[in-house]
UniProtKB/Swiss-Prot annotation:
Name by which UniProt lists this protein: GTP 3',8-cyclase
The reaction(s) this protein catalyses: GTP + AH2 + S-adenosyl-L-methionine = (8S)-3',8-cyclo-7,8-dihydroguanosine 5'-triphosphate + 5'-deoxyadenosine + L-methionine + A + H(+)
Disulfide-bond pairs as recorded: none
Residues engaged in binding [4Fe-4S] cluster 2: 275, 278, 292
Upper lineage: Bacteria, Bacillati, Cyanobacteriota, Cyanophyceae, Synechococcales
Top-level taxon: Bacteria
Oligomeric and partner information: Monomer and homodimer.
Listed CDD domains: Radical_SAM (cd01335), Twitch_MoaA (cd21117)
Organism: Synechococcus sp. (strain WH7803)
Similarity field: Belongs to the radical SAM superfamily. MoaA family.
Pfam families given in the database record: Mob_synth_C, Radical_SAM
Amino acid sequence: MSPAPPPVDQWFRPFGVLRLSLTARCNLACPYCCPDSEELPGLMRLDQQVRLVRVACGLGVHTLRLTGGEPLLSDRLLPLLEALAAGRSNAADPLARLQEVALTTNGVLLTPEKALALRAAGLDRITVSLDALEGGVVATMAGLRGGQRAGERLVEQVLGGLSAARRAGFEPASGGLKLNAVMRRGLNDSQLLPLATLARERGVELRLIEYMDVGNRNGWAPDQVISAAEMVQRIDARWPLRPLPRESGATSRRWSYADGRGRIGTIASITEPFCGDCNRLRVTADGQAFTCLFASEGTDLRPFLHSEETLEAVVRGLWQQRRDRYSEERQGFTASAPHAEMAYLGG
């Protein structure tokens, strides 16, 4: 029997991507994310996480993104990957429909041993976040004490993590290793070309993210946003770019360098919203499901995690009722509208 078609929401968007946060804790304190220092109570157990992913795959999910906080802080990461790999190898298991399991990390804990373990456990892709290369700017963007020296140490760790991931088999050429950077005017906009230079030298796709109004702690203001168009224009003036087709459901628009030295992408939730084909559901480490990054509250899945049948009915119904289009409707919301925090949602 063929699987039932994926549910569609009120705007006819299918369910395709599950973003699962493993922890809200982080070893950095980036001001745009504002992570918590203590673990959430009531975290999902490993068996519940696997059950959730299996149900999501039965509803059409083809991509799983593991997030945080900092997911490498979670002692459940490797056991989860191993359990998912076992399911993916069984054609009769809905987990076999997973085409990609990806991880987003700040790279600080991405040692050679950890990178090899992640690859062996079945992880397909790693995205490393790095917002600057100059020590003082890095310290500001990562919320570090110790100024320039602390920032320089962090850059060394993250670049070491990138190298470790590549040696472990996460290949940039096939999309297995990418670099993320959140750009904020007046803080790290001077780092745009240095980051692009680094990515070109290492053959890694650089994804440039507009500073977003997620959460209530980061003091977001529109004049702090560097638009994707401006970022592309500045890079194109240095190294000519060629636009690439946008894939359905993708968060990013992409360009290739005319000289063949790699690609960049932009995630422009502020200036070029992509709500129209958004196919993502976010579930926090404590089992709250959010149908939009900018939502103020979620749906508690924990009462339903004991049964795949019950959980499937709840998640299907949640998706079918979904109407979120916050980024497209942003101007109609008041400045005081509450949002869940980025570190809690997992980006």
